[in-house]
């Protein structure tokens, strides 16, 4: 009996983990934390040419409505506490994408006294998107990597 036979009878069997993770990957709501030129590429990814809506990704203005934070750009020492505060306001489960060389490790400003050498020193990062600035395609690749990571996580303790 194939899937067609099961659908005719009105039921499908699966695990709760798979259903929950499928729903989470199909409705990711990122909050933009644009700090520099990478934010322009992030905005371009949400525009009509790339259309992140087809992946179920809708940008949210509030951290309380988001489950993904995209950190795009140079993180300075004065902005680090604000980043942590916004991250703490996000509901669980939450994920972070670090976009661009500056967010990943400080970029060109790595040795500056006022730059945090990677946002992973402030918040836990799930996916790193390389580039300076990374293209919209690279951000979409990073989002797809995060979706792959979410699909393989266990949501229910065993």
From Swiss-Prot:
It is an enzyme of class 7 (translocase). It is a peripheral membrane protein. InterPro entries: NADH_UbQ_OxRdtase-like_20kDa, NADH_UQ_OxRdtase_20Kd_su. It is found in: Cell inner membrane. Keywords: 4Fe-4S, Cell inner membrane, Cell membrane, Iron, Iron-sulfur, Membrane, Metal-binding, NAD, Quinone, Translocase, Transport, Ubiquinone. One of its GO terms (molecular function) is iron ion binding. It comes from the Bacteria. Binds 1 [4Fe-4S] cluster. Its cofactor is [4Fe-4S] cluster. It catalyses: a quinone + NADH + 5 H(+)(in) = a quinol + NAD(+) + 4 H(+)(out). The keyword Nucleus does not apply. [4Fe-4S] cluster binds at residues 37-38, 102, 132. One of its GO terms (biological process) is aerobic respiration. GO terms for cellular component: plasma membrane; respiratory chain complex I. Its EC number is 7.1.1.-. Pfam families: Oxidored_q6. NDH-1 shuttles electrons from NADH, via FMN and iron-sulfur (Fe-S) centers, to quinones in the respiratory chain. Couples the redox reaction to proton translocation (for every two electrons transferred, four hydrogen ions are translocated across the cytoplasmic membrane), and thus conserves the redox energy in a proton gradient. Belongs to the complex I 20 kDa subunit family. NDH-1 is composed of 14 different subunits. Subunits NuoB, C, D, E, F, and G constitute the peripheral sector of the complex. This is NADH-quinone oxidoreductase subunit B. It comes from Alkalilimnicola ehrlichii (strain ATCC BAA-1101 / DSM 17681 / MLHE-1).
